Amino acid sequence: MPVNKLMIQMGIPMILSMALQAVYNIVDSAFVGNMKTGSEAALNALTLVFPVQMLMVAVGIGTGVGTNALLARTLGQGNSKKAAKVAGNSLFLGVIIYVVCLLFGIFGVKAYISSQTTDAEVLEMGVSYLRICCVISFGIIFFSLFEKLLQATGRSLYSTIGQVVGAVVNIILDPIMIYGIGPVPEMGVKGAAYATVIGQIASAVLLLVFQIKLNKEFEHDVKYMKPDAGIIKEIYAIGLPAIIAQALMSIMVYVMNLIMKFNPSAQTAYGLFYKVQQFVLFLAFGLRDAITPIIAFAYGMRSKKRIQDGIKYGLIYTIALMILGIAITEIFPGAFATLFNAGQSRAYFISAMRVISLSFLFAGINVAYQGIYQAVNSGMESLVISLLRQLVIILPLAGIFSTFARNGQMGVALIWWAFPITEVIACLVGYVFLKRIRKNKVLK
């Protein structure tokens, strides 16, 4: 099948899957923002817990990305026994990841939330919500792994079905558990947390069934979960940059929360906008998850033409998606503010929408670059782009701009401009890396 058609066929389900993943957080915030009492504090609490939620997803998805690329390459080489070991070791890693999240949920959440706020109501809500999400995190972790196993064998439609089921369960349960309907008592933010984790578990269970029944290219057996240091090293050689890339997103949001601690309304507005931004950029992440196995498979076959087609169409489709995202966020910022019932944060939220959305085009291209790098074993280049986007440029710029905002010399909107500036610089560096990779790995 031609690469352009294959990318559409594989990409659409993945894009929908990633977009629906972002729906979990958007739906929670929308329902929480419309609570009768304490909605402002609740929205602020969800903003503060968001970095840890992203970190859990980052580790799960990053491990899955490494598994995805390695599994696709191994199957391309016709090695079904190693493919079974790759799948089994990914599940072993999932168990380890869950244990870490469980321990943090029991012992670490209060200290984490306390570092970002002194408001007792926000602290109580944040701790309650995050503890539930961490202690019952096995759903999101194993969903992320099963999703990538299905995607690696070209069955991305089934991973999307699982995501849809989880999203629907979450949306149905949110109003029931947050507001209290029928015999279910009103639980507020705790209800939002329970609705989220139940939706994640529903997705994971369904994908487990699909994995066992449909992925026949390799054997399924508990014996393949026995840890193999070589395979784990290969998984993380590919997946670690993806983990770091998304973990850096968590660090960035956490530090931005600290930077804007001087203005809780702006802090909340940034958290709300980030969920909208995540929805848009997850379109690029979804397409990246099609770009990576397509190019990785072609790289394993040594097909220069298919590698170059994968790069070309991956970038073209990403740019088209990001232009659509910019149009929606620039035209309808007020509608999103109303959805979240943003209250005192409304003006800050709209200004963030207007400015930061300008960065989407360059951010999407950077995400596509990273998918290309990972497919051809150029994980270091992917890591450098992540560091530039999420740490090296953005945080110093935001810190400097916040100094002017705190002093009253400029408005909070100045901080938002750090995002477009950062993405443009990272995109230029990414283009240099791409030219070098084409010369040394594709055309050589």
Regions found by a protein language model. Give the residues of each.
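Interfacial/gating helices of multi-pass transporter permease domains
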Residues: 9, 32-54, 121-125, 189-190, ...
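Short alpha-helical transmembrane segments in multi-pass integral membrane proteins
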Residues: 1-11, 71-138, 184-240, 295-359, ...
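Helix-terminus/linker motif at the lipid-water interface of multi-pass membrane proteins
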Residues: 19, 23-44, 113-120, 176-187, ...
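Transmembrane alpha-helix boundary and packing residues in multipass membrane permease domains
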Residues: 14, 18, 30, 69, ...
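Short runs within selected transmembrane alpha-helices of multi-pass transporters and secretion channels
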Residues: 64, 133-151, 159-167, 192-207, ...
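Small-residue-rich hydrophobic transmembrane alpha-helices
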Residues: 43-103, 140-159, 269-333, 363-377, ...
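N-terminal transmembrane alpha-helices
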Residues: 2-38, 51-66, 70, 95-102, ...
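Transmembrane helical elements of multi-pass membrane transporters/channels
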Residues: 9-28, 132, 166, 199-203, ...
